[in-house]
A protein has these predicted regions:
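General small-molecule cofactor/ligand-binding pocket signal
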Residues: 2-4, 190
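Mid-domain catalytic core of redox enzymes
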Residues: 7-138
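Active-site-proximal substrate-binding core of FAD-dependent oxidoreductases
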Residues: 14, 264-281
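Hydrophobic, well-ordered secondary-structure elements that form the walls
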Residues: 45, 85, 146, 177, ...
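Glycine- and acidic
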Residues: 80, 152-162, 238-244
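C-terminal segments that line or cap access tunnels to active or ligand-binding sites in enzymes
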Residues: 88-198
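A glycine-rich dinucleotide-binding beta-alpha-beta segment and adjacent secondary-structure elements
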Residues: 119-127, 183-245
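A conserved FAD-binding loop/helix module that cradles the flavin
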Residues: 241-264
Length: 281
């Protein structure tokens, strides 16, 4: 196995009705007139968002058509706002994992899923990892991870920069924290980082900044995400939160196993069995 890190895939290369490998962006984004690095492959597995794979990494009209078909059937799942706070104080009322719920979940979900706006009274997940591992923060200090679900990015929404939604929404989050027992938190923040839906979209190529792939609304969509075998190319395979079986760490792991098994089946390679690889007798 050869791992190549710090390089973005610029496109999946297609020829004669199949994919033949991937092309990498130049180092530091500068080609200096040199051809792009190409990695040949008999099979390609994409763990990028399924819509982004079809729209941004493939060029065939059939891929664009498939992306539009997915967009008609599904909407992106919700996104999230993350605050990373380093504090010079500890708060004894929190454990490693903490939830602070909205007073009205119906209004919260209506804001996020129907109106497409940040929830006015959000549910918050707060992790204080130093409760389990004291080395995660200096003595007497705290490192907090704060996640608030919000709507995926709608047309015209600007999250980052002056006047953006992050600038407007962070006070809502901090106000709730003060009401949840972090009364003097503002004067104890020594390190602060934020991650917005726009940042998630850029970092992970996630459509609309969605953190759970495609939404599972409706009776059928929960169990019928896009298949692990691409409908466009027979030797292209899909995995991740927007592919079968869906989002969340356990199912994403299952998605990877399913995609790998599809490759093995299609290439007539015996599937692994517990304790070793199965072979014909």
């Amino acid at each position: 196995v050869n791992y190549i890190t710090g390089r973005r895939v610029s496109r999946i290369v297609e020829r004669d009705g199949k994919v033949i490998g991937v092309e990498l962006e130049p180092l530091n984004g500068q080609s200096n007139g040199k051809p792009a690095d190409f990695i040949a492959a008999d099979a390609v597995v994409s763990n990028c968002d399924v819509q982004r794979t079809n729209r941004d990494l493939l060029s065939a009209p059939a891929a664009r058509s498939e992306q539009k078909s997915i967009a008609r059937k599904y909407t992106p799942a919700c996104s999230g706002v993350v605050l990373y706070l380093g504090l010079n104080k500890q708060y004894n009322h929190v454990s490693h994992h903490n939830f602070f719920f909205s007073k009205n979940s119906h209004e919260e979900f209506d804001d996020i899923y129907r109106k497409g706006i940040p929830a006015r009274d959000p549910t918050m997940y707060i992790a204080a990892p130093s409760r389990s591992d004291p080395t995660q923060a200096p003595p007497g200090c705290e490192a907090l991870y704060i996640l608030v679900h919000t709507a995926y990015i709608r047309d015209g929404q600007k999250w980052d920069g002056p006047g953006g939604l992050m600038e407007q929404y962070k006070p809502v989050i901090m106000d709730k924290m003060r009401r949840m027992g972090f009364t003097d938190i503002d004067r104890h923040i020594v390190v602060e980082r934020t991650l917005s839906p726009a940042g998630i979209e850029k970092m992970y190529n996630a459509e609309g900044g969605a953190i759970y792939g495609l939404a599972s609304h409706g009776r059928m969509h929960g169990g019928f995400k896009p298949k692990n075998r691409s409908r466009v190319y027979r030797n292209l395979y899909l995995t991740g939160g927007s592919a079968n079986p869906g989002p969340g760490t356990p199912m994403v792991m299952m998605s990877g196993v399913t995609a790998a098994n599809c490759v093995l089946e299609d290439w007539k390679i015996p599937l692994p069995t517990e304790g070793g690889r199965s072979v014909a007798s």
